[in-house]
Amino acid sequence: MMLAAPAIISTTAQQQQPEWQSQYAVGLNKLDPHTYVWPYADASEVEKGTFEQSPYYMSLNGQWKFHWVKNPDTRPKDFYKPSYYTGGWADIKVPGNWERQGYGTAIYVNETYEFDDKMFNFKKNPPLVPYKENEVGSYRRTFKVPAGWEGRRVVLCCEGVISFYYVWVNGEFLGYNQGSKTAAEWDITDKLTDGENTIALEVYRWSSGAYLECQDMWRLSGIERDVYLYSTPEQYIADYKVTSLLEKEHYKEGIFELEVAVGGTASGTSSIAYTLKDASDKTVLEGSRKLESHGSGNLIVFDEQRLPDVRRWNAEHPELYTLLLELKDAGGKVTEITGTKVGFRTSEIKNGRFCINGVPVLVKGVNRHEHSQLGRTVSKELMEQDIRLMKQHNINTVRNSHYPAHPYWYQLCDRYGLYVIDEANIESHGMGYGPASLAKDSTWLPAHIDRTRRMYERSKNHPSVVIWSLGNEAGNGINFERTYDWLKSVEKNRPVQYERAEENYNTDIYCRMYRSVDVIRNYVARKDIYRPFILCEYLHAMGNSCGGMKEYWEVFENEPMAQGGCIWDWVDQSFREVDKDGKWYWTYGGDYGPKDVPSFGNFCCNGLVNAVREPHPHLLEVKKIYQNIKLSLIHI
């Protein structure tokens, strides 16, 4: 009800605006957010995690037909109809931002709205964005439903599209979505044909959602994450929640809890079974329950189980188990298989200190934007390169700044051992922190809740996620109080942080950014504090930097409630281009023109590594100070 009720409060004037100009229009006809229920063909594939190889998964990445216009009035309004001729259209790579493929202008700004500028003849006025200057990209491609999907449910998933889009299949309208960093899904089963099918997306560069995506990054547009289909039986596993903790006396015994939601219908009495296996493929826990009804809406809550001397997950020893879930029909035949990796670990604030498995942890962290030559589309290979470099340089924590990352990133963090601060895709920096802040405007609550909920539901089962973050640099007010309340109602274990909450109730960690060493010392000297000080950002690794790191870590290693922080940031957000003479060079804000384009210049380059992941010299300083073993010469 919290999500639906505010949508009917809009004024007549707002109702006359298109959906992409309304703060209430967070989505239409989308499936409820849930953990990833990857389809697998058999149990052996769950261990490998190779869901893309499943016969019930179909990628729609690749070449799409594309048409780009400078304003909505000139867009091809009927392009979504299969009969519409696209023979003269260009091809575009999906995923990939259109500015990196020859359309529009890549703009880099920091804390301002790029459209709040004379270049676009517009002053910020939420929820409105420029109309005449708002670019629209029309995407189309065809596909055939794979053999073996007959009689099964089919879901379309768009992992990330910025900033707002409408979607059709075979000319039939599915809905729309706003919010570029979490998946949106639609059930398209009854829209499909036996032969060729047509999918169409109409994408707007700016929307009301842009007011919540004012992050320090290149402002780009288009389909920037994967698009795919997956298929389930008519009765299917809709969601599941794994709680895998340690008992809090000795932190040696594992506590396993499992909830499974089943959707759809079946003709007989179905059952759900789970198996938990260790790294040697030995079954350590299992259970089975019959569903209470043949219809949809079944929620199965398994009894809590204990696992003595469990192999604990942490960043140094990322011990993982494999959970296998099987849905079975009345005859005991397996109709669906899915699963995930499970790590037993406890993340908590204990006696004023941030602890993993009961042990205080020093956060040796870094902030990470998603950045590549394609824009904000990052390949699996580049993600693996990032995490290997981080581990090689003693980094143990990554803050997903400032939005949920690609789903593969969490799998890597689970496997390699990296603590994750998962952050909701909310930053309204350009509105400031005062009375105009969107944090204080309750008409924006549905959007804040939607983004927070989608972050939590998709990533709730990852052991690497040890802290949730409500967002970044968006002021504080009723909307962040409500998102904190919601998260704490569903998350009983992991801490929640928000930098702009400062010492208000809606943060479990005092996580101010760029505070001096003296400020930290003064905080931990107080007698009234009960939250650890962990800087969500510090050092700002631009140019020849990180020179004050030693002084910070003298405090962190000697003051129990000062527990480190996350360096800003991991990678330079620049692009490598080639001039007319064949020489390469780095580009920064403003380099793509025109002359008066909004720009923060080379402020996009604050990384410990450059844009092609070559380490800067100060990364070695970080490696030295972040090392876990310190030696000193003594006289004997």
Question: Which ranges hold each PLM region?
Answer:
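Accessory carbohydrate-binding/adhesion or oligomerization-edge regions at the termini
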Residues: 14-118, 198-202, 206, 279, ...
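Beta-strand-rich binding/interaction modules
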Residues: 167-169, 253-291, 300, 633
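Low-complexity, Pro/Ser/Thr- and charge-rich linker/hinge segments at domain boundaries
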Residues: 224-241, 344-359
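Surface beta-strand/loop "capping" patches
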Residues: 234-266, 617-633
